[in-house]
Each structure stands twice: as C-alpha cells, then as structure tokens.
C-alpha cells in the first residue's frame, strides 16, 4: 500500500483538522511525546508549525491543511482544491481604540504584522507607502507601546484586541482553513486525491446544509 504523507498544523487548527479528517475516514494518530511524525493505516502524519505547512506540501508531502492566510503569505506552489468548513476568521487593520483615521490616510504609517507580504500588497494596491515591521507574535504589543501606528493581524472573537484597548478598523480579507495538495501528487496519486476531494466536498456541503 502506498503511504500518503500529510502535514497538519500544530496549534489552533490541529483539533479541527483531525476532526475533519476523521469525518472523511482518515484517523489521525497523535505522535508519541517529543515525536514529530506518526503513522496510521497507510498515512504518515507530520506536525509542523502552520506557517511551514505549505513549504512541506510544495516540497513533497502529499497533502496538508492550514489557513488561507498562510498560503497567501508564503505563496508556495501548491494545489488548493477547496476551502474547509472551519478555521473561519478574518485579517484586519487594527488601531488604538481612540484613533479615528481612514486607511487612505495611512501613508507613511508603521504597520506591525506577522504577515508582511499580505500587508505590503494590500497597501500597495491602495497606492499607499507604509513601513512594515515584521514581528513573530503578540503584535498587539507594538500598538500599545507605540512602536507601530497600527497592526495587521488575525481577528476571531475580537476579545484580545479589546482587552488591549485596540479596535478592528478595516477588514482586509476573510480567512478559512484550506486543503493543500502537492502538484506532483495531484497527478501521480490522482485517484486518491480525487476521492479525498469528493469526500471533503460532500462533508462540507453537509455541514452547510445544517
């Protein structure tokens, strides 16, 4: 039996990814302590950081799951057959709660973010030049300490930004978990991939129907 390799994101999407795969007949085995790979019923499961999932899939891992934000930021060569019915959130421009300004007037702003490419492209498309500060986490701190004029980050409930006296000012895009497929796997394991996509679509449509 051919082994199928799958990269699943460690972090907030992992449990939903496992639940989704179980619904379409793929049981994910948790890795042993300190292990990064597990094996179950012809599958090899890898558990990289979400930001690295597209890199693994582009470079030989058969399938993966991560957020659409990660795919857009990394811009790897992967096949994305469909959005998945979880991981729903949005990416937004976030400001101190007492600041009133339109994004059209943010020329020259310092923007802190974990998503420099998406941020740069958004402001470039609006014809605005901004300075981007690439951070790896807790970007709210950059706005609170004043090293950035605004931040671009993921918003789910909005509780974190409210707790830090910030506000969601402008939505840049909606985000969802997505299924990734290696470009070569798409051709060499066509029957498996086609079956997987059909099962995923059927499950997604069933979720929408409820």
Swiss-Prot record:
Coiled coil: none annotated. PROSITE patterns: ATP_P_PHORIBOSYLTR (PS01316). Keywords: Amino-acid biosynthesis, ATP-binding, Cytoplasm, Glycosyltransferase, Histidine biosynthesis, Nucleotide-binding, Transferase. Pathway: Amino-acid biosynthesis; L-histidine biosynthesis; L-histidine from 5-phospho-alpha-D-ribose 1-diphosphate: step 1/9. GO terms for molecular function: ATP binding; ATP phosphoribosyltransferase activity. Pfam families: HisG. It is found in: Cytoplasm. The keyword ATP-binding applies. The keyword tRNA-binding does not apply. InterPro entries: ATP_PRibTrfase_cat, ATP_PRibTrfase_CS, ATP_PRibTrfase_HisG, ATP_PRibTrfase_HisG_short. Belongs to the ATP phosphoribosyltransferase family. Short subfamily. Catalyzes the condensation of ATP and 5-phosphoribose 1-diphosphate to form N'-(5'-phosphoribosyl)-ATP (PR-ATP). Has a crucial role in the pathway because the rate of histidine biosynthesis seems to be controlled primarily by regulation of HisG enzymatic activity. Heteromultimer composed of HisG and HisZ subunits. Lacks the C-terminal regulatory region which is replaced by HisZ. HAMAP family: HisG_Short (MF_01018). NCBIfam families: hisG (TIGR00070). This is ATP phosphoribosyltransferase. The gene is hisG.
């Amino acid at each position: 039996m051919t082994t199928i390799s799958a990269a699943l994101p460690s972090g907030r999407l992992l449990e939903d990814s496992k639940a989704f795969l179980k619904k379409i007949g793929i049981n994910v085995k948790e890795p042993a302590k300190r292990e990064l790979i597990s094996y179950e019923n012809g599958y090899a499961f890898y558990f990289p950081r979400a930001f690295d999932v597209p890199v693994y899939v582009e470079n030989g891992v058969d399938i993966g799951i991560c957020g659409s934000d990660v795919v857009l930021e990394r811009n790897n060569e992967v096949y994305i057959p469909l959005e998945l019915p979880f991981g729903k959130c949005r990416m937004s421009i976030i400001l101190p709660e007492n600041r009133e300004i339109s994004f059209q007037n943010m020329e020259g702003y310092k923007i802190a973010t974990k998503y420099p490419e998406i941020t740069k492209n958004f402001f470039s498309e609006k014809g605005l030049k901004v300075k981007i500060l690439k951070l790896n986490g807790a970007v709210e701190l950059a706005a609170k300490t004043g090293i950035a004029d605004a931040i671009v980050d993921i918003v789910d409930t909005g509780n974190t930004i409210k707790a830090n006296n910030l506000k969601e000012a402008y939505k840049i895009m909606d985000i969802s978990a997505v299924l990734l497929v290696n470009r070569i796997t798409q051709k060499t394991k066509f029957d498996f991939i086609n079956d997987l996509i059909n099962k995923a679509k059927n499950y997604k449509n069933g979720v929408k129907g409820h």
